[in-house]
A protein has these predicted regions:
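Mature N-terminal segment immediately following signal peptide/propeptide cleavage
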Residues: 23-66, 81, 600-602
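Extracytoplasmic electron-transfer domains, predominantly the class I c-type cytochrome c fold
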Residues: 180, 262, 475-479, 483-486, ...
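C-terminal motif of bacterial Sec signal peptides marking the signal peptidase cleavage site
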Residues: 15-17
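Extracytoplasmic/lumenal domain signature
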Residues: 53-65, 95-115, 144-176, 208-244, ...
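Sec-dependent signal peptide recognition
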Residues: 2-9
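Short, solvent-exposed loop/turn elements at domain surfaces
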Residues: 22, 37-44, 67-71, 96, ...
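Repeat-blade elements of multi-bladed beta-propeller folds
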Residues: 30-34, 72-92, 118-143, 177-201, ...
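Periplasmic c-type cytochrome electron-transfer domains
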Residues: 36, 393-407, 411, 417-422, ...
Length: 713
């Protein structure tokens, strides 16, 4: 009896010890973009925890070798890790595989060797396994590649010897559309479901959602986000909208409920972004969360977050699939964060709101031909995770010498409430064009029901400009090129060719000193970085732009001016705009009182913010006695059972670990370049790692080409 008691006591002690001691599994993958198909950005890993995170050190670095010298390349990839191998993409969108323990390269694939333009943005890759066969899918420009995941060689039985064109099947003359895919597709059985990036001007192609056979590359189904005749939502557009309008695309990824066979797809705005007089109506399915049947592509439900968008309020990230406890019941739901700083929480099965959502009146437009939608949806809960308006009272006084000029500017532009329509007078859009929330996504902890979200609180300035008619009296090709430039290029590169303040779009007033004429022509044709290719522009119009940029005095016959000057938007859109301009001081700081970047914890069961802290720091301001301001940030968080949140994203180029319960910053490490990507975490042979792409290249910071992995000693 005594022996039995001793044995029982020993057994209880062992069980108790196992319960209290946190154990990391031998091998835990990060097999899908953002961690899993439900986009939770969550890992059941706890070897690295609040007790030991300060001991975290770099254990390997992998250099891709192709960062740009002009600090304009980026690396936004969230790498996947499967069975000890990490797969990702480089600044020039080369796919690679490395050993996840050592960082040693296994193979690399260069799409440029296969006639694919590879200088757009890539956020990752998609893995599919059928028996022993392992395949990797990724897009470079408009080409979707299928590779042998073990060798990096193209799979000849997929599409056209290993690739398919994402331009095919869009519309007649689809080869002229700018099409790319910046975010990985998602796998359901033998399907890979893909969205695309398209132009944001009136030349945009349609944003079809398509499912391809993962074995053959054949198109299995297509969902028209601009409905065709007879399809649901057709009446929310002009009758011929499906033939001539574009956008309403899904560029930011998607989430999948495999048990229900439902895929949840966030969509962007219709094109042109800031004037919709030629697309009057509610514009379904732009700015929607779409729930589709994964087998057939049929619509199950939708929820539109912005009606008739005029503010470039694309849904920037895939929804998190979550479970909400409400009124004593557990409800399978989703949460969708927006650039506006709002969070929509919907029933996953029906699309019905979990918390009330109210349609509120918004201001009317005074632009020619435009008709704004009368109301917009505002969630009552959760409360916004950013401020919702900016007035002159919100200007900080860190640099008193600018007070008069800032107040003068504030008195001349429209501001002070959400959904102020674009105008020739100018407006402040807040939160800005890059959120609020952005493409890095949010981390959801299924154990606590807490959502962790990083956000920007940056005001941007915006002004519409009436398009000038061409000067038919000129005999210089450069004069025609100037008008074409202002219509197609000035929104990003500036009305005076000055570029943007952060360096994302370079100045062109010195392009003669930096690039050869043929190099500029290649970029116009194919695009580079954030710039799309301009395939829709006639060759004569491209020559006119080049004549303008290179100060050429080529003369043309007056009768040719009108033909060359039939610009893409003229007669379609009567306005262009001054571009995407952050409202910054000359020193580069936002003009609004901090915080400028935040990390928040939102209790999704209550619909309440549990805590919010600044994300990032300007050390020079902190030394002046100014509290941490936070910084603009890109890339998202991940959360673990070790009670930690890991996030890079901030302009100061640190990766950080926060206590998920309190928001306390526990650890930070200065990266070789900005970690403007969502990190991944995984375990191999019982050792947990955290890895992040350090591509930099945003917010005026240097570009990089390194992946850095961290672990405990």
């Amino acid at each position: 009896m005594q022996i039995k008691r001793l044995f029982l006591l020993s057994f209880i002690c062992i069980v108790s010890a196992c319960t209290e001691k946190k154990i990391t599994s031998e091998n835990v993958n990060w097999p899908v973009y953002l961690g899993d198909k439900s986009s939770q950005q969550y890992a059941r890993l706890d070897q690295i925890n609040t007790e030991n995170v300060t001991q975290l050190k770099p254990v390997w670095t992998y250099s891709t070798g192709d960062a740009s010298d002009d600090n304009r390349s980026q690396m936004q990839c969230n790498p996947i890790i499967i069975d000890g191998v990490m797969y990702g993409t480089s600044p020039k969108v080369k796919a690679f595989a490395v050993d996840a323990i050592t960082g040693k390269e296994k193979w690399k694939f260069n799409p440029a060797d296969h006639d694919a333009h590879g200088e757009n943005i890539s956020r990752g890759v998609t893995f599919w396994q059928n028996g022993k066969q392992k395949r990797l899918y990724f897009a470079s420009g408009a080409t979707l590649f299928c590779l042998n995941a073990e060798t990096g060689e193209m799979m000849a039985d997929f599409g056209n010897n290993g690739s398919v064109s994402l331009k095919e099947g869009l519309r007649e003359n689809d080869s002229s559309f700018y099409v790319a895919s910046t975010t990985p597709g998602i796998i359901y059985k033998d399907l890979i479901i893909m969205g695309t990036t398209v132009s944001e001007n009136s030349d945009a192609g349609p944003g079809h959602i398509r499912a391809y056979n993962a074995k053959t590359g054949e198109t299995v189904w297509t969902f028209h986000t601009i409905p065709h005749p007879g399809e649901y939502g057709y009446e929310t557009w002009p009758e011929d909208g499906w033939q001539r309008l574009g956008g309403a695309n899904s560029w930011s990824g998607m989430s999948l409920d495999e048990e229900r066979g439902m895929v949840y797809i966030p969509t962007g705005s219709a094109s042109f972004d800031f004037w919709g007089g030629n697309r009057k109506g509610e514009n379904l399915f732009a700015n929607c969360i779409l729930a589709l049947n994964t087998e057939t592509g049929e619509r199950i439900w939708h929820f539109q977050t912005v009606h008739h968008d005029l503010w470039d309020r694309d849904l920037p990230c895939p929804p998190n699939l979550i479970t909400v406890e409400k009124d004593g019941k557990k409800i399978d739901a989703l949460s969708q964060a927006t650039k506006s700083g709002l969070l929509f929480v919907l029933d996953r099965e029906t699309g019905e709101p979990i918390f009330p959502i109210e349609e509120k009146p918004v201001p009317k437009t005074d632009l020619i031909g435009e008709e704004t939608w009368a109301t917009q949806p505002f969630p009552i809960k959760p409360e916004p995770f950013t401020r919702q308006k900016m007035t002159a009272n919100d200007l900080h006084n860190f640099f008193p010498e600018y007070a008069d000029s800032l107040n003068d500017l504030m008195s001349k532009v429209r501001t002070g409430q959400p959904f102020i329509p674009p105008s020739t007078e100018g407006m402040i859009i807040f939160p800005g064009f890059d959120g609020g929330a952005e493409w890095g996504g949010q981390a959801y902890d299924p154990e606590t029901g807490m959502l962790y979200i990083n956000a920007n609180e940056m005001p941007w300035l915006h002004q519409m400009i009436e398009i000038e008619k061409e000067n038919t009296q000129t005999d210089l090709l450069a004069d025609v090129g100037k008008a074409i430039y202002k219509l197609n290029c000035a929104a990003c590169h500036g009305q005076e060719l000055q570029g943007d303040a952060t360096g994302s779009y370079p100045p062109l007033n010195n392009v003669v000193e930096r690039l050869k004429r043929d190099e500029v022509k290649h970029i116009i044709n194919n695009g580079k970085g954030f710039m799309p290719g301009f395939g829709h522009i006639k060759s004569e119009e491209k020559e006119a732009i080049l004549a303008f940029l290179f100060h050429e005095d080529t003369k043309i016959q007056p009768k040719d001016v009108h033909e060359i000057g039939k610009f893409s938007n003229e007669g379609v859109v009567p306005y262009t705009h001054t571009g995407y301009n952050r409202f910054l001081l000359p020193e580069g700081y936002p003009v609004i009182t901090p915080p400028w970047g935040t990390l928040s914890a939102i209790d999704l069961n209550k619909g309440e913010i549990a805590w919010q802290v600044p994300l990032g720091e300007f050390e020079e301001l902190t030394k002046r006695g100014i509290s941490k301001t936070g910084t603009e940030n890109y890339g998202g968080p991940i959360v673990t059972t070790g009670d930690l949140i890991f996030i890079g994203a901030a302009q100061d180029e640190y990766i950080r670990a926060f206590n998920k319960k309190t928001g306390e910053e526990l650890w930070k490490y200065k990266l070789p370049a900005g970690g403007y990507a969502t990190p991944s975490t995984y375990s191999v042979n019982g050792k947990q790692y955290v890895v992040i792409a350090c591509g930099g290249g945003k917010m005026g910071t240097a570009s990089g080409d390194k992946y850095v992995a961290f672990s405990l000693p």
